[in-house]
Structure formats: C-alpha cells, structure tokens
C-alpha cells in the first residue's frame, strides 16, 4: 500500500515548503527555465503542471485559483494569455527535468527545469535586435 507517500518534506516546515515552491513556480513561469536540486524539481512539477492546466481554460474561477496559488497578478496574466494557449493541445507533461550534474559544495544532484515548447533564445534575441 502506498498510504502516506504523498510528497517530499525537503527538510522544511510546511509553511516554508509552500513558500519555497510558490517562489520557484513564479520563477519558472517568469524565466521558463530554472536550475535547482533534483528533489525540488520533482516536487515543483507537482505544483506547476496543475497551474498550467488551469491556464488552458480562462474563466474567473480558474484565475482566482491561480492567484491563490501564485499570489502574483502578473504571473496569472501570463499564465492565461501566453502559457494556456501555448499548451492548449498538449494533455499534460508541460515540464522537462534534465539532470545537470552535482553541486560543488555538497554534491547535491542538480536539475534543469524548463517548460516544453518554449521559444528558443536565438529567436527572442533576433526579435529584440529588430526592434
């Protein structure tokens, strides 16, 4: 039986863990790629993927739920105007977790978390140069 195997504690209290995952999800929504430890990346996936699924259907109730989870209006706007339409046809699996070696100080396994189908950096740089 798998009772009680819900989530990783990550050596934090529940409020600290909630705040950390909220900050990490906001950073991921802003930059679309972040570097963190592997266990944090796996927990982050359980927070961000339902958020993007909320963003696929734009209504007031979903916007309020997303605001309750991110506490930032700018990210809610980006979630429903950019990310929701981008992943409208994809049935889940919005994040890619790539193993990224080990941290020098404590040898912790690191991971690169990125949104799938994100615009390439070269395309964004080319558009910025034209403007």
Swiss-Prot record:
<protein>
    <recommendedName>
        <fullName>Large ribosomal subunit protein bL17</fullName>
    </recommendedName>
</protein>
<dbReference type="Pfam" id="PF01196">
    <property type="entry name" value="Ribosomal_L17"/>
</dbReference>
<comment type="similarity">
    <text>Belongs to the bacterial ribosomal protein bL17 family.</text>
</comment>
<dbReference type="InterPro" id="IPR047859">
    <property type="entry name" value="Ribosomal_bL17_CS"/>
</dbReference>
<keyword id="KW-0687">Ribonucleoprotein</keyword>
<dbReference type="InterPro" id="IPR036373">
    <property type="entry name" value="Ribosomal_bL17_sf"/>
</dbReference>
<dbReference type="GO" id="GO:0006412">
    <property type="term" value="P:translation"/>
</dbReference>
<comment type="subunit">
    <text>Part of the 50S ribosomal subunit. Contacts protein L32.</text>
</comment>
<dbReference type="GO" id="GO:0003735">
    <property type="term" value="F:structural constituent of ribosome"/>
</dbReference>
<dbReference type="InterPro" id="IPR000456">
    <property type="entry name" value="Ribosomal_bL17"/>
</dbReference>
<dbReference type="GO" id="GO:0022625">
    <property type="term" value="C:cytosolic large ribosomal subunit"/>
</dbReference>
<keyword id="KW-0689">Ribosomal protein</keyword>
């Amino acid at each position: 039986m798998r009772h009680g195997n819900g989530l990783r504690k990550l050596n934090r209290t529940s409020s600290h863990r909630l705040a950390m995952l909220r900050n990490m999800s906001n950073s991921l929504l802003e930059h679309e790629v972040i570097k963190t430890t592997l266990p944090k990346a796996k927990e982050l996936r359980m927070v961000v993927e339902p958020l993007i699924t909320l963003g696929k259907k734009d209504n007031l109730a979903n916007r309020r739920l997303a605001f309750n989870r991110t506490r930032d209006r700018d990210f809610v706007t980006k979630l429903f105007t950019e990310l929701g339409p981008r992943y409208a046809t994809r049935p889940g699996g919005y994040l890619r977790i790539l193993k990224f070696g080990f941290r020098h100080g404590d040898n912790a396994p690191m991971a690169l978390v990125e949104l799938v189908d994100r615009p390439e950096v070269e395309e964004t740089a080319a558009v910025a140069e034209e403007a």
